[in-house]
């Protein structure tokens, strides 16, 4: 179990797991230390019990030796008394004493047997204690080795944690640098986004102004178209009326010429008649006499004159009718003049509207001062209508090319939008990589700048187109002025009206074509404006997404800061834990040293106990020898007692007493070295016990 625990912290783990493993190792080491302390306390208690048992056995042995010596002294005393009073009447008392001695001997035998059994049990206990001591010693040595391994592992882990701490510090410094760079980049991106917002706002304002101008121009163009249509219709009506009037004028002129011819004929006839009258008056005066003769001729002439008067009356009536027709024609001419004046007024209103448009476009000019020179050059270059028509054709071609280029640009923008969508998906997939996000943001900013430049170029192109439309309107205005001049000239020269009408029709056809082209260009511009609105909305969405990404980056920055603070707190906690683990290791080392000292003391105690055991073995062998000696002595005493009984029976006390005294002397001589021999191991045991007590006190 301890080997598996010591190998487990070698695995690479995070700081929290390492801290938990350190806490678990500290807990296990404290538990092992407490268990070892408990084992040592149990072992010490067991040793104290063994020592107490040894002391009790020593005290019992001393008591037995004292009792044995007392019994021997009593036996010797009784023998002496028996020797002294062998023939006295106190033999009964001697027999009683012998019986008592025999009973005491039996008790001593039982005590010896009990002592032998206790000796065997003590031997077994000593063997068991030695085996347990050796096992505990091996277990403690193994535990000490395992603890040393754990200490080495803890040192290795501490070194690994120190290296990890250094690596974490380096990573923290690099992350802080990256955070600072990211913060700088975020600030740069924010400033760039603010600048782009300002540019976009300015572009929006310009776009709104252009939209307003375009809406105004479209309204004015619609009004002008409607007015042009009305003028065209009026011009067509006027052309028809002029044609009718010209026809009527031609017919009336022909009639007037006929009537003039008739009037001339009549005048000639009048002159002839007056001449005739003069001649006739002269003839009457000369031929007064021939009146009677010529009354018939006069009556006939009167009839002729009446007829002539009737004819003259008819002529006067015809003249009156002609005068009425002339007055009516004059009225019609006045009406045509009034209509032409109304047309002139309408043209003046159109001119005034055009002046207002010119003023509005002058305001647009003031906004686009950089292009005023080009406008003046183009205004100076586009004075003639034919050149303007050619220029308008060229401009139409240019507009077509521009539309084609804008369509290609729209396609490119659609491709860019698809690419942007794909990039957005890639951004969503790669949102975790801050550096890649920053690079993509930079690329997006560059593309946004390029697109802003493109939008600026498109706005410039739109301004150019507006200026071209202004030029076209100016050309229209010049055409209208020429038409006004032509109408004024029509009043002076009706014959040139047809030619001017043809030119006006050509101009109107060109203006119609231009209006159609302007309508198509307006529709294209509306489409472009819608596309640009969509693009602006896309850009706004992209800006919103960029803002959201920036907010996400800020939140990531805040989370990283919080994680940094947590890491710092973990580092501080790890440092505290390392300090505590170092303190615990020092305590463990001190405890291990104490355990080593206890083991040394235990080994010394074991050595002392082994010595004591050897001494006990020697004592046991001595006791066995003493028991053999006591058995021999008892055998000899039995033999002596039997002999004494036989001698008492034989009542040969004197000879037997002398013989017994002679036998007792060598016995006493034999007992004296035995006593010395018995006392010598007692003294050795006392010395060994005193040494054990000294070691224990130490």
Swiss-Prot record:
Where do the record's region annotations for Disordered lie? 659-685
Keyword Metal-binding among UniProt keywords: no
Residue ranges under compositional bias (Polar residues)?
Answer: 659-670
Q: Which InterPro entries match?
A: Centriole_BasalBody_StrucProt (IPR051877)
What keywords appear on the UniProt entry?
Cytoplasm, Cytoskeleton, Phosphoprotein
Q: Which domain of life is it from?
A: Eukaryota
Q: Where does it reside? A: Cytoplasm; Cytoplasm, Cytoskeleton, Microtubule organizing center, Centrosome, Centriole
Q: Basic and acidic residues compositional bias: what residue ranges? A: 671-685
Q: How is it modified after translation?
A: Processed into N-terminal 27-kDa and C-terminal 55-kDa fragments.
Q: Does the keyword Amino-acid biosynthesis apply?
A: no
Q: Which residues carry this modification: Phosphoserine?
A: 163, 688
UniProt main location, coarse: cytoplasm
In which tissues does this protein get expressed?
Expressed in the testis, in spermatozoa (at protein level). Expressed in actively dividing fetal tissues, including sternum, intestine, limb, kidney and stomach.
One BP term from GO:
cell projection assembly
Locate the region Interaction with HIF1A.
556-689
Kindly list the GO CC terms recorded for this protein. centriole; cytoplasm; motile cilium; neuron projection; sperm fibrous sheath; sperm principal piece
What this protein is reported to do is described as: Plays a role in spermatogenesis. When overexpressed, prevents nuclear localization of HIF1A.
What disease association does UniProt give? Spermatogenic failure 26: An autosomal recessive infertility disorder caused by spermatogenesis defects that result in acephalic spermatozoa.
The entry's family comment says: Belongs to the CEP135/TSGA10 family.
Subunit structure, interactors included: Interacts with HIF1A.
Which named protein is this? Testis-specific gene 10 protein
